[in-house]
């Protein structure tokens, strides 16, 4: 067991690492960011948001935020998309894809299907050299140096970066 002081210090360290991840995103804001926001603000259809694993959970949160602020949005799980759910996408929709690696098998199968539809694709990705980043119209860089978890395993800072 840890002492209360040790627990407090761990908490401060975790929050500091999360803060560093957000600062890195601030440094990464570029023209793609501005163009992606402009595209979202001018969409006449839905904003379709998708991801795999923890990125899918963040995608659902983003959809909830869009809907609560008046932007029509729907969640489409990337695994379900390649098994028939692509039917929810209309020609006037835009698609936001979230992925830490940008290299998951589901994303690699999904991207050609989405590109063939002609919708604008926004990647929120932690690897700007990834397959996803190279296929998207706009790339929002959510690269983080380390996760805030002690073993650098749980997607803590990377999911915070995606949500911001």
Model-predicted regions and their roles:
Residues 1-45:
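An N-terminal, well-structured beta->alpha segment
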